[in-house]
Amino acid sequence: MMAGATFALWVIYGNIFVISDTLVIGILFVSGIFTLLFLVVGASTEAPDNPTVIDWTLSLLSAACGIYFFLKAQVIADRISLLEPLTPLQLFFGSALLVLTLEATRRTTGMGLTAVVVAFLLYNLFGYLLPAPFGHGVSSYTYVLDVLVFTTDGLFGVPIQVVASYVFLFVLFGTLLAKAGGGDFFFNLASALTGKTRGGPAKVAVISSGLYGTMSGSATSDVVTTGSITIPIMRRLGYTRRFAGGVEVAASTGGSSMPPIMGSAAFILAEYTGVPYREVVYVAIIPALLYYFGVFGQVHLRAVREDLRPVSGSVPTLGTTFRLGWMFVIPILVIISVLMIGYSPTYTAAIGAASVVVAAALSTLTRMSLWQIVEALGETTLRILPVAGACAAAGLVIGGLSMTGLGMKAANVIIAVSGGDPILTLLLAAVITIILGLGMPTPSAYILAAVLVAPAMTRIGFPLLESHLFLLYFAIMSALTPPIAVAAMAAAAIAEEDPFKIAFDAVRLAIVGFLMPFVFLWNPAILAIGSVPEIILTVVGAVAAVAALAVAVEGMLERQVPRLERVGLLVGAIVAVAPQTLIAVAGIASIAILIGRRLYRDPSVVKGDETQSGSDGVECGVCGPRAICEPADPPEVPEAKER
């Protein structure tokens, strides 16, 4: 813990007070992370908390590499890459760092990403044996090592630089906020807003997981953290195991698309596109809100379909929630304000982290002790380990791609296969990005897609920012997409259900996330790009489309919706987001007529949030959600049967 806290303090000091070149920052960060990583994430699964001789050896070798590269940083920076031969010491330490990166990747992310990196390394070395269009010139081992380790195009390139600066500081912000009690505040806020409505616990999961996910940036971490609370509650309410897990997975996965933080991949997107991070946040707001509106709507309609009315019980009120946790709103407002003023993400994150400590000190209930701050620093370092390992590996891939030109070759192949057709190109881009993201962290999936797929999209005319945001969305969605669906696997352990069943329910709940990228490339006004009237009409149309999609998917309002009407709603949803004004208005009107007609027939749909509990009874999990039993003493509610 103390070693991690010390490292975190160095990162803060280096980013805020020391101006240094990117090579030195990358060298010190990578070597420091690896030194800790091999001691924390052990090679032995039998005794992970007891480092072996191998672990200590790798840790010391990481430190030695860091010392050598730091002492020789100026020599490395001054040498002419690919022309001046590497010295024996450079060959040794460069090779050692390459092997250490592969092992660090294996320990933090598993064999999936490690196999990808090894495959690209083999391609760099032996790709000259392949026929056109994928063959390249002969590359010796020293040539490959020179590019990957001794320049800022490989290991010490953009991904690791981003992690070493503002990603680390934003993770610190989230960790401090959680340590001070911000996580409880957000959960209580979600409970106060939706706890007494139909399907309340599931709606609490949607809101709280979204709020937590924007800070963590990891769907799996979010599922484990919030799902351990929300999934059992949803089960007791009457949701099936698979649906409860699916709700948590869909809500947690979307957190990486929710401003203002959006996880680490969004920072990398800003670096690759050259677009200020505040602009990335600005254009991502409407799609993220629509995503959660879609999940929220399906959760409510499922509660209607299953007749899962609210259960009586203690739910925090808004007044109590804000009275005890109002100070946690301050850091969020600080982050947003500083970003909008124009400060860099690094300074924004640092100021935000400091504001958490200051805001928490405003109440004796939330005031942080020195030891809690030290714990938060140490936990930040631990949480950054898998991200750093993945981004270091991604740096090796990017270096190899730039060296061999594979990125442009892949773009040529995509365009050739699609024939330059925009729709087919987008479908190929979506499928490739999801495949690249299966079992991999979102940053790695996005980076690979940005290098391999984005050039094809921009070459046929799609705008740069929208193209990269398209790829980011599908990199995020890969976390819940079968057959791997790492977030669903995490939920399966909590829900005690087949991860494939959870994943399929999560995909249905997250359907807006799969469709939204196509929509904002078709109609950029949904990204708040364009005139105010265009944006307003598009937002209204998108809200109507998402509502129609939720009804069509669940087939429910207060009663079953006939198939023909569901088809009509799907068609209306497509038309409502069209960039042409008259067509969009026609789509909105058709949705309003279909849903309004159904609501007029079934007016009870708007009255369905009464608590299902009589004055003397409680809901019985044995008799079913419609039954009201009258025991002498309120019993403990047994777990509901599977539906």
What positions do the PLM features span?
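Cysteine-cluster motifs in flexible loop/terminal segments that predominantly coordinate metals
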Residues: 617-632
